């Protein structure tokens, strides 16, 4: 009997000890920290140059703030690979002002979350954080056929290679070209205007040349007339001298 009671009390002691230990433990760690665009790209790899641009323009901080805001509608980011940046003409980025670099990054960000299937039903041009495409400065058009999504900007055409990351707030897609907006790069790809026939391209210089030509011609005329007068005077003097001898 005593042995049975001892066994029961021992079990009760162990039971309460386990409960006390369980409730006394620190809570399990919560989910990972807030969404961080650069951390996502670093984990994916091959986006070093885009990450550098995000950080130098502080666009990464703005994106992270928007993603973790309760009023956010989500974001869509088109991330060019390092190969895409390396294929740019030398000095392309260095020729941009700080404000233009910010706009270039913003042109790669849509202010809403768009999943891959939704690309088939979007209305063009899409609005980016750089501005409204309706004004013709930052147009971004999407065409989708099956699993292939193509992007055109009026300057370059790019293809969405794959989905890098997606959740309820953010979608990141890998693109094979840097998306160059028309507002900043349109003139660099537009063909040079062909010269008009008849030399009308240099009308301004031609009119200027006419003025210059008139003054030159009049000077020549003056010089020619002056020389002609000297020759006449000389001939007359010789004739007069001859008549005296005769």
Swiss-Prot record:
- Where do the segments described as Disordered lie? 193-222
Q: Which organism is it from?
A: Arabidopsis thaliana
Q: What membrane topology term does the record carry?
A: Lipid-anchor; GPI-anchor
Q: Name one GO cellular component term.
A: side of membrane
Which residue numbers fall in the propeptide?
Answer: 220-246
Keyword Signal in annotation = yes
**Where does the UniProt annotation locate this protein?**
Cell membrane
Q: Which SUPFAM superfamilies match?
A: FAS1 domain
Protein family according to the UniProt entry: Belongs to the fasciclin-like AGP family.
What is the protein named?
Answer: Fasciclin-like arabinogalactan protein 11
Going by the UniProt record, its keywords in alphabetical order are:
Cell membrane, Glycoprotein, GPI-anchor, Lipoprotein, Membrane, Proteoglycan, Signal
Q: What is its main location?
A: membrane
Carbohydrate-modified residues are 36, 68, 141, 150
